[in-house]
């Protein structure tokens, strides 16, 4: 059962890969025609060579120079034409390969943007990047070359077999002795190599994921002096990746030499037996009418055709090794493409417009794993234009609540409503555009500062961009830069301080001008002067908007209209700062501990 399933999986993967190839039918048809012409022309060479050699008439002392000259000239023409066809085919395959790579990368990347947030929570960024780069390159190398090469091998093998049969049926029997051995050896080795190539791809993805994770946190690594530990962990993963590469490539590489050795034995046997036939024919022991009669030209042609026959079989073994690698990479690529995207908006979904900002959370229960709830029976009413702060220890469910508000995940039980309507009745796009977010982990892309500020509003004018920067108190810093707003940010903005990056994202939020706002620990880990600028910008940004604020620095949320204290997924306390301090509960103790620490 497992074997049948495996075979079906291979066939399905090959057919699916082939569908990408045949999207470019004109290229494929042209490539096939060039391949066919090149191989058929090359097959004429040994036959012409045989005629030229036979025209020498060994043992008679006469040479038919006209026949020799004619066939030599034809050989030059045939081989030159075959080489030209091969050159054109190679150029065409490069172009075809690029088209396939473009299509695959576009499909994978576009699909990634439709996947639910949970996919990115459970997959390393470096591993995903490995799919888009290495795996697609591996598939392309096999798809644009190996499949056509298999067709070329079939033509060469069939043509060579036909010529060999016409020359000496007896030698065909001699040659065929080793063919089953070659086929069985190839089949045995390829069966063992595919799991090794899958492991190789997986280990490379793990290595890339770890490298990406560590490089993005290299400052933290240095602060805590963890360089040696990180290097050791990288060495372990690197060694595992190299071991996986060695095992896969070693077992894949020995297929070709093994098959080549078997084929060389076959050719040696043919040459030996054929030589005996030729000597017996030359001395007259074998009459021309004998099925074993053989002259020198025919023996030469037979050996050449046996080489041509064996060559594709040897190449086929190497191609199979490449296909094992390609199928392993394809499994990973199709794993992305087959991952279900976010659930589609309902057919009756409406666009959220004219947003007031009333939010009602009713009896909401949610867990990333349905058996373990992160938020439990939460009920909260958030009036339009109010500021709701969310505090609590790590793992209390604060960030999860934000994920639910934005519909990165849907609730397991209960409902969340905006302006009196369940958010599942709105289109996701319109719901998310109703919010703007300022996160602790700021994200700046490779582009100018102006482009980063305008990220949430494509049609923003320079005047609007500069006004947003002034509102965020970042305009002065930007103008100190040599290129001002046209300064290019690289490497995710590493040349800009954390506070300045947060101010740029606040400017982005000002420009987006959404009616609802989410601030996720936006003032953590910045100096006091920058924090004052951020707090001033925040107060302006929050005016007139429904705001949800997550912060560990409780001093920053004293002015919130309502503070939700979360512990273990439940709201344990709720009220204004003053009322919560009067209660003397968990919030008060948390606030006092931070205040005492600050003292």
Range-by-range predicted roles:
Residues 58, 64, 163-177, 251-331, ...:
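Helix-loop-helix
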Residues 28-88, 92, 165-170, 281-296:
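Transmembrane helix-loop-helix hairpins at lipid-water interfaces of multipass membrane proteins
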Residues 345-346, 352-599:
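ABC-type nucleotide-binding domain
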Residues 1-14, 118:
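Short, membrane-interfacial amphipathic segments enriched in basic
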């Amino acid at each position: 059962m497992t074997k049948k399933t495996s075979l079906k999986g291979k066939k399905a993967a090959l057919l699916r890969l082939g569908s990408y190839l045949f999207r470019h039918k004109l290229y494929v048809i042209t490539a096939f025609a060039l391949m066919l012409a090149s191989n058929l022309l090359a097959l004429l060479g040994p036959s012409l060579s045989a005629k030229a050699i036979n025209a020498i008439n060994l043992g008679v002392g006469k040479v038919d120079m006209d026949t020799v000259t004619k066939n030599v000239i034809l050989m030059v023409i045939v081989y030159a034409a075959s080489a030209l066809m091969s050159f054109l085919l190679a150029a065409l395959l490069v172009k075809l390969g690029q088209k396939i790579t473009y299509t695959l990368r576009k499909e994978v990347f576009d699909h990634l943007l439709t996947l639910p947030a949970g996919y990115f929570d459970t997959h390393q960024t470096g591993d995903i990047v490995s799919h888009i780069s290495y795996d697609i390159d591996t598939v392309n190398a096999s798809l644009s070359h190996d499949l056509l090469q298999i067709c070329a091998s079939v033509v060469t093998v069939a043509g060579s077999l036909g010529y060999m049969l016409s020359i000496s049926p007896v030698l065909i029997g001699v040659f065929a002795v080793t063919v089953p051995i070659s086929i069985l050896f190839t089949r045995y080795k390829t069966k063992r190599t595919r799991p090794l190539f899958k492991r190789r791809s997986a280990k490379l993805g793990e290595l890339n994921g770890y490298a990406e994770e560590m490089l993005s946190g290299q400052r933290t690594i240095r602060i805590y002096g963890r360089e040696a530990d990180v290097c050791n962990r990288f060495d372990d993963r690197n060694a595992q990746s190299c071991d996986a590469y060695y095992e896969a490539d070693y077992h894949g590489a020995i297929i070709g030499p093994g098959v080549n050795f078997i084929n060389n034995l076959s050719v040696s046997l043919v040459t030996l037996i054929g030589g005996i036939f030729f000597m017996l024919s030359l001395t007259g022991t074998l009459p021309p009418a004998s099925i074993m009669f053989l002259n020198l030209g025919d023996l030469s042609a037979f050996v050449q055709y046996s080489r041509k026959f064996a060559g594709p079989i040897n190449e086929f073994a190497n191609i199979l090794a490449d296909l094992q690698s390609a199928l392993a990479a394809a499994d990973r690529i199709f794993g992305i493409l087959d991952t279900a995207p976010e659930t589609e908006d309902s057919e009756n979904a409406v666009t959220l417009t004219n947003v007031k900002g009333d939010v009602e959370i009713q009896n909401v229960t949610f867990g990333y794993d349905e058996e373990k709830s992160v938020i439990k029976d939460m009920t909260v009413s958030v009036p339009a234009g109010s500021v709701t702060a969310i505090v609590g220890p790590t793992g209390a469910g604060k960030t999860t609540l934000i994920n639910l508000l934005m519909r990165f995940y849907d609730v397991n039980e209960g409902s969340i409503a905006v302006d009196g309507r369940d958010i599942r009745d709105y289109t996701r796009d319109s719901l998310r555009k109703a919010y703007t977010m300022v996160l602790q982990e700021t994200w700046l892309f490779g582009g100018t500062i102006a482009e980063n500020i305008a990220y949430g509003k494509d049609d923003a004018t320079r005047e609007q961009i500069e006004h947003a920067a002034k509102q965020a108190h970042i305009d002065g810093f930007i103008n100190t830069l040599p290129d001002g707003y046209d300064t290019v940010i690289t490497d995710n903005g590493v040349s800009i301080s954390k506070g300045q990056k947060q101010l740029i994202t606040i400017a982005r939020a000002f420009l987006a001008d959404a009616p609802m706002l989410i601030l996720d620990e936006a003032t953590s880990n910045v100096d006091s002067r920058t924090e004052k600028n951020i707090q001033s910008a925040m107060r302006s940004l929050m005016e007139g908007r429904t705001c949800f604020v997550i912060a560990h620095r409780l001093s920053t949320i004293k002015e919130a209209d309502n503070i939700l204290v979360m512990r273990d997924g439940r709201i344990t306390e709720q009220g204004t700062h003053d009322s919560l301090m009067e209660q003397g509960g968990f919030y008060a103790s948390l606030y006092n501990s931070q205040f005492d620490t600050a003292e």
